[in-house]
């Protein structure tokens, strides 16, 4: 068990580091055939050692070539993916289920950083993730092909309802990127767990917004990214959605 857990920790770290490097390139809209870069300032190509962020950690989060400070996601994305991969291994009985959970956790966590850094939930991440979810989510506990279908349909219905409900509050109240993430969560989690995910994310976002308003750190109409809350709800539902739904129903 200890050896397998260590492998999941290492695998999550590598997945997160690769996702970080790919994000750095995607922000510049560089073609897929272009070389992977570790630093956009000095254009230093990514090396195999960059899949483990130890060198940057020893260099205090700076590029080893030009010493410019790297975005904080160089640390938080790999470490977060590593921790989530370990949690998936400890949560699921089957290593295959845990591996699939770790991959989806990486995809979801990546969206947190794109929304915070660029106010964007990019199609180049969300749409391929939908395809992967439609093809692999049946591996996860409690999921079947029908759950994928009905979950996607329910996610689409919830997304449309939220878009319509947000219209009186202006164009930025609920974006199309948020809607697509809900559809992704529906495909990944199934009908019952996507309800859990949306409920948790809505509750958390509402409480967070209330605290910001009460402390006057935000004003009504200020931008607040929904992506991180949707991802939080999705990850909780991925790990414990079935149990939460059963508790609520019973």
Model regions and ranges:
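Interfacial loop-to-transmembrane junctions
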Residues: 177, 210-236
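Transmembrane helix-loop junctions in multipass membrane proteins, especially transporters and channels
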Residues: 24-33, 90-94, 116, 141-145, ...
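Membrane-interface helix-boundary signature
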Residues: 3, 67, 93, 97-100, ...
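N-terminal transmembrane signal-anchor/hairpin module of polytopic inner-membrane proteins
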Residues: 1-92, 246
């Amino acid at each position: 068990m200890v050896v397998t857990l260590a492998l999941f920790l290492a695998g999550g770290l590598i997945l997160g580091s690769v996702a970080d490097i790919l994000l750095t390139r995607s922000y510049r809209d560089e073609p897929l055939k272009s070389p992977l870069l570790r630093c956009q300032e000095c254009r230093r190509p990514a090396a195999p050692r960059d899949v483990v962020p130890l060198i940057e950690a020893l260099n205090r989060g700076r590029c080893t070539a030009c010493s410019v400070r790297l975005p904080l996601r160089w640390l938080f994305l790999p470490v977060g993916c590593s921790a989530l991969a370990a949690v998936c291994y400890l949560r699921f009985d089957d290593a295959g289920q845990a591996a699939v959970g770790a991959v989806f956790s990486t995809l979801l966590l990546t969206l947190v950083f794109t929304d915070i850094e660029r106010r964007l939930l990019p199609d180049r991440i969300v749409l391929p993730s939908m395809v992967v979810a439609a093809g692999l989510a049946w591996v996860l506990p409690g999921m079947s092909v029908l759950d994928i279908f009905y979950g996607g349909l329910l996610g689409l219905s919830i997304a449309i309802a939220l878009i319509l409900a947000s219209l009186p509050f202006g164009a930025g109240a609920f974006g199309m990127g948020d809607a697509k993430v809900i559809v992704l969560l529906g495909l990944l989690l199934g009908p019952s767990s996507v309800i859990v995910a949306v409920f948790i994310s809505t509750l958390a976002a509402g409480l967070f917004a209330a605290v910001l308003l009460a402390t006057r750190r935000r004003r009504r109409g200020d931008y607040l990214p929904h992506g991180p809350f949707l991802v939080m709800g999705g990850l909780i539902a991925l790990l414990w959605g079935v149990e939460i739904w059963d508790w609520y129903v019973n």
